[in-house]
Amino acid sequence: MKTACFPVFRNRLPDLDRDLDRDTKRVCGIKLTHDGAIAVVEDGRLVFCTEQEKRNNNSRYQEINNLDAVVAALAENGVNARDVDQFVIDGWDGEAESRFKVLSGETPVILRGAPYVERHAEGLLDWIGGSGLTLGDRVFSYRSYPHVTSHVASAYCTSPFAKSGDPALCLVWDGCIFPQLYHVEGKRASFVKSLFPVTGQAYAAAGHYFGPYKQTSRGGWDLGVAGKLMAFVALGSVHVRIVAVFQKLYQEHFAGDTALACAFRANINNSESSLAAVHDFFAASALQLGQRRPKTCLHRLIFSSNVSSLTKWRTLQHHPLPGARNLCIAGGCGLNIKWNSALRQTGLFDSVWVPPFPNDSGSAIGAACCEIVAQQGFVPLDWSVYSGPSLQDRQVPAGWHASPCSISEVAAILASNKPVVFLSGRTELGPRALGGRSILAAATSPEMKDHLNEIKFREHFRPVAPICLEDRAPDIFSPGTPDPYMLFDHQTKMPWQDKVPAVVHLDGSARLQTISRNSQHKVAEVLVEYEKLTGIPLLCNTSANYHGRGFFPSAAAACEWGRVEHVWCDGMLYRKPSATA
């Protein structure tokens, strides 16, 4: 079968005064590789973002290997590809450009895109263009910006700094790069510095050598391991001797003047060789540490390097950049709530913003934002976290009883210590369930955490997050500040650790999500009604999905899964035959 291959062209930063660019109204961003997604921005407003893992019980991190998925996502949201003014493909691995092999229907297509990282300090908005995006029976031109640019754009444009027009720093730490610091102001963004020479994939790679996910092979990359290890570190403690081993090997392999370290830094844009170097580091660590369990020590060492580098940079800066006390965090490492919280607590920044999709689940949004930024500068995006796919209308399995059910009745079921699959409105964006595709449960018994982990086939040490009314959070948690996207760590205050044990992690922390009691989302109403019945303003909140797959796309999918007896979906309650109300 013949492969369609189309010419590409390159350009530098577009002329911001070009009339052609100013006429662009509807932009479609596409992320083809893992965490594949399609997003449409129209007149500065996010219309929708369809992450592939959230369609049809697809596998987590689902890529787009057939461009028919783009056509389908557009059609599901009432958009014809011909009505899109500009398509933008997120860049990927490659020093000069990336290359994507996909299908359009049954026809193989090769698309070329921008590289992973900008090629010079002012090159974030340098783009590569092509004309081979085959959607249905039509071929469209497209642009592609560096992958890192999409992280910067999605983080800043969704931030409060963009709304107020204030400059900010943006820290991007992704799988294949060192933590990179950028400065965003007005119509420009520029690279400031790399903080230290450790790639984001190091945290997950450690799982091949230490802890419950240890394996003998270097293959079989699991994108979910990093998050699981974030929970696992609560089982350990810091040991000076173990940290010393890591520090010594860190200098030898990554940061020092050895031939090994210099070669690693020189070849950072080669993803295969950089990953091999990370594996070599952990293999050497495992050999020296033997049976000792160093995961918590590694976590502490990497974070200390981050803070130390930021502090040193701030101290040595003779001419402070505007907005240097505002920080956006993006990249896959932005999902690490321990690091996010510690950065927020350093005192280096007045305000820290992490979007609900800091990892590649936000890259399609970021790709669309890149085009807006190229035209207008770093303007704010009008967006909602509940902009994913709508619920599908499918027939539930035979035997399930369906009846109308009010929010107060849902609260009563929860107060009787029965979990409820809660499906409402459009899917939330990003990897965290935020009340749109959640399993809710009372947090008043420690057994509930074990039960939720069991029905979801999760390890016993995995935490269950609380969703709490915003105005009550400071009573229960420290700091208890508003955190609507579950991306920071909070300590549970002692009087409440016995009241809500199901949401207290092994180290006393909680991955808190707050929501205003005046929110229009139905999950806020549930919390208000539950508080009236019990005096407790929070519930357990964990994602509603098959193990290893995206959120349930319908009530029917939740019933087919069948591991929770009550499924509530936009006003209807579905009960398993054996269940009691």
Curated annotation (Swiss-Prot):
Cited InterPro entries: Carbam_trans_C (IPR031730), Carbam_trans_C_sf (IPR038152), Carbtransf_dom (IPR003696), NodU/CmcH_Carbamoyltrnsfr (IPR051338), Nodul_NodU (IPR048155)
GO molecular function: transferase activity
PANTHER family tied to this protein: NODULATION PROTEIN U
Family assignment from sequence similarity: Belongs to the NodU/CmcH family.
Taxonomic lineage from the root: Bacteria, Pseudomonadati, Pseudomonadota, Alphaproteobacteria, Hyphomicrobiales
Species annotation: Rhizobium fredii
Name of protein: Nodulation protein U
Primary enzyme class: transferase
GO BP annotation list: biosynthetic process
UniProt keyword terms in alphabetical order: Nodulation, Transferase
Cysteines engaged in disulfide bonds, as pairs: none
Domain of life: Bacteria
Cited function: Involved in 6-O-carbamoylation of Nod-factors.
Known EC number: 2.1.3.-
